[in-house]
Amino acid sequence: MAAKDVKFDTDARNRMLKGVNTLADAVKVTLGPKGRNVVLEKSFGAPRITKDGVSVAKEIELEDKFENMGAQMVKEVASRTNDEAGDGTTTATVLAQSIVREGLKQVAAGLNPMDLKRGIDLATDKVVEAIKAMAREVKDSDEVAQVGTISANGEAEIGRQIADAMQKVGNDGVITVEENKGLETETDVVEGMQFDRGYLSPYFVTNADKMTAELEDCLILLHEKKLSSLQPMVPLLEQVIQSQKPLLIIAEDVEGEALATLVVNKLRGGLKIAAVKAPGFGDRRKAMLQDIAILTGGQVISEDLGMKLESVTMDMLGTAKKIQITKDETTIVDGAGEKAEIEARVAQIRAQIEETTSDYDREKLQERVAKLAGGVAVIRVGGMTEVEVKERKDRVDDALNATRAAVQEGVIVGGGVALVQAGKSLEGLTGVNADQNAGIAIVRRALEAPLRQIAENAGVDGAVVAGKIRESEDKNFGFNAQTEEYGDMFSFGVIDPAKVTRTALEDAASIAGLLITTEAMVADKPAKEGAAPAGGMPDMGGMGGMM
């Protein structure tokens, strides 16, 4: 086992603080509408330019192991805030830096670190309550656009597109962000349920120009096993022909004779038909087939339930106003399912989302909710160069996360003002001793740090701005760094999601509290230069001629 280097007391804390400051100083230049970019070196390709706090934090590794430990702990603040709220990583980093810096000063002055931490926790809980009380629901898509714009560093176009997408797919809809090949940023919305399985044979195509199969007022047969022969289905197919409606078969697979028979019937014009594979795999496939059944008012023909193809009747088939099938995707629009049943299914999937511990499962379950309840929108981000597209995509991702958070827990005044106003709730709060009171004072001072940083990035004196806002009785009064004006932040459209601000403070206080109470640090000793590698052979001389 390698020898360890151990640091204690002031030496350990100073090294740790240096690491915290190095990382936080690199991240905080991105804060606010006039925040700057950070350029990140890539091992291959062009450097990446970003204003996303967590992307900057993730790139930083320091040479000194003790400093690096401090930096990594603050990186954890940014990562946790990003995971929980999806935005607010820079705010969280600035708060953590301020709490750690002030806290370590007090520890150096002889105060008890544990009592300081208790005071910090006490103050944080009080401020979080105040933030929750200040939050108000998002009224309309204009406010959604404002939240998106602020999070995208003042680019109104991004905010507007996210608001449009959310309006179209609803709060339950899924919005994904992709890179676009062109210059423009555009939004595509898919209404109805779409899944990534296309037609099994190009002979099913009805629109030769677009190479799509389009079925209007269509019947849908859902079968969870493979279809290799149509013999058991003949009575059903005869009824379908009499009804003169098109039929879509969704099954695990349709192969061999069954597929050939369907194609021949389609070409002869006797039967308007198409077949696609069922989406998903294993248990997820069963669940998705059941979703389609509920959406279209049909039943899944499943051997688990003792159903056979021979006994399928017309009332077991689902129906939909329109179905469009390309070679890669199937879209079912306006299924005939009962609204109450669809809502019950959505509630059931939501309960599974609450219980699951896997991020992958959660994402897939949320997609299923969106397909049943809302729809799916794709924002394709464009730009002149690849570097610009990646930088804009970072901002669109942040803005999207911020708008989702705003819909969940409401909005508060932005620009760091809410934290300063919430800090007024600490007046009169006292701990059980003077050291805890010092912890409360640390949080009160730290709450001004994001506001000061936003002002300083805009080239204005942060202390003056913080003083003006502190003195104001109006809770919405703040400083708009974009226009450098004072006034009502709601009327300026400078608003933040309550969830983002709350999460940033909770995560910053949690990890800063751990750093303040650190008394010793242990790291591997660096290997001495020129030391022989362990286990090497003493002499390999005289073997130079061997190839």
From Swiss-Prot:
Q: Its domain of life?
A: Bacteria
Region ranges (Disordered) = 528-547
Q: What is its main location?
A: cytoplasm
Compartments where located = Cytoplasm
Look up keyword Chaperone and say if it applies.
yes
Spell out the subunit comment: Forms a cylinder of 14 subunits composed of two heptameric rings stacked back-to-back. Interacts with the co-chaperonin GroES.
Q: Which family does it belong to?
A: Belongs to the chaperonin (HSP60) family.
The entry's keywords: ATP-binding, Chaperone, Cytoplasm, Isomerase, Nucleotide-binding
Quick one: which residues bind ATP? Answer: 30-33, 51, 87-91, 415, 496
Q: Name one GO biological process term.
A: protein refolding
Source organism of the structure: Ruegeria sp. (strain TM1040) (Silicibacter sp.)
Looking up InterPro entries in the UniProt record yields: Chaperonin_Cpn60_CS, Cpn60/GroEL, Cpn60/GroEL/TCP-1, GroEL-like_apical_dom_sf, GROEL-like_equatorial_sf, TCP-1-like_intermed_sf
Any Pfam family: Cpn60_TCP1
Please report the name of this protein according to its UniProt entry.
Answer: Chaperonin GroEL
Which stretches does UniProt call biased (Gly residues)? 538-547
Q: Which reaction does it catalyse?
A: ATP + H2O + a folded polypeptide = ADP + phosphate + an unfolded polypeptide
Enzyme Commission number(s): 5.6.1.7
GO molecular function terms here? ATP binding; ATP-dependent protein folding chaperone; isomerase activity; unfolded protein binding
Q: What does this protein do?
A: Together with its co-chaperonin GroES, plays an essential role in assisting protein folding. The GroEL-GroES system forms a nano-cage that allows encapsulation of the non-native substrate proteins and provides a physical environment optimized to promote and accelerate protein folding.
Cysteine disulfide links: none
Q: What is the main EC category here? A: isomerase
Question: Which gene is transcribed and translated to give this protein?
Answer: groEL
